[in-house]
């Protein structure tokens, strides 16, 4: 298995979730045990030598890679969720969308002062969701060690929004 093979497995769905969008569907990677395992192993390899305490990931697809990666690396996992989905006291961060705003939440006790956190997601597009996730970690006193993606849509320039963070992406479209 290679990253090029993983890239070829990510199919493009036209006009989803709305007209004009070419959605990158990772479900073929997830359903193939060898491809999914290889993806997690390559994410783990990309983080070799780094010292961090936690992995945080936004819902929903970030969970699919963040939780198994945390398990593989022996660190804790912190979910970053849409409003009203976490049961304990939360901290919220509102961010801009193309049309309007959205927000994400994290438990107030999820990250301790000075803890180093890697943020994981399946795809870097515009960077808005990951930027909000990073700001939540920082508001709690955490340090964003790096942000890692399985894939990146380079033509959307999401890296610009994440300027100042150490960005890793394994597959580029």
Swiss-Prot record:
Enumerate the InterPro entries for this protein.
Ade_phspho_trans (IPR005764), PRibTrfase_dom (IPR000836), PRTase-like (IPR029057), UPRTase/APRTase (IPR050054)
Superkingdom field:
Bacteria
As recorded in UniProt, coiled-coil segments are: none
Tell me the pathway. Answer: Purine metabolism; AMP biosynthesis via salvage pathway; AMP from adenine: step 1/1
**Which Gene Ontology terms of cellular component type are present?**
cytoplasm
One molecular function GO term is: AMP binding
UniProt keyword terms in alphabetical order: Cytoplasm, Glycosyltransferase, Purine salvage, Transferase
Top EC class of this enzyme = transferase
Q: Which Pfam families match?
A: Pribosyltran
Q: According to its UniProt entry, what is the function of this protein?
A: Catalyzes a salvage reaction resulting in the formation of AMP, that is energically less costly than de novo synthesis.
Self-association state and partner proteins as the record states: Homodimer.
Homology family: Belongs to the purine/pyrimidine phosphoribosyltransferase family.
Return the protein name.
Adenine phosphoribosyltransferase
Organism name: Thermoanaerobacter sp. (strain X514)
Q: What is the lineage of its organism?
A: Bacteria, Bacillati, Bacillota, Clostridia, Thermoanaerobacterales
């Amino acid at each position: 298995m290679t990253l090029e093979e993983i890239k070829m497995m990510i199919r493009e769905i036209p006009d989803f979730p709305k007209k004009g969008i070419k959605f990158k569907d990772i479900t073929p990677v997830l359903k193939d045990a060898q491809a999914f395992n290889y993806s997690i192993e390559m994410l783990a390899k990309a983080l070799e030598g780094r010292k961090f305490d936690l992995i945080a990931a936004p819902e929903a697809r970030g969970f699919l890679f963040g939780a198994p990666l945390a398990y593989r690396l022996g660190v804790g996992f912190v979910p970053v969720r849409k409003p009203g989905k976490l049961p304990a006291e939360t901290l919220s961060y509102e961010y801009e969308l193309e049309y309007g705003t959205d927000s994400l939440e994290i438990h107030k006790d999820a990250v301790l002062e000075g803890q180093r956190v890697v943020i994981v997601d399946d795809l870097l597009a515009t960077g808005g969701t990951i930027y909000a996730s990073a700001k939540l970690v920082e508001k709690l006193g955490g340090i964003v060690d790096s942000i890692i993606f399985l894939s990146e849509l380079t033509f959307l320039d999401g890296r610009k929004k994440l300027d100042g963070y150490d960005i890793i992406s394994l597959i580029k479209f």
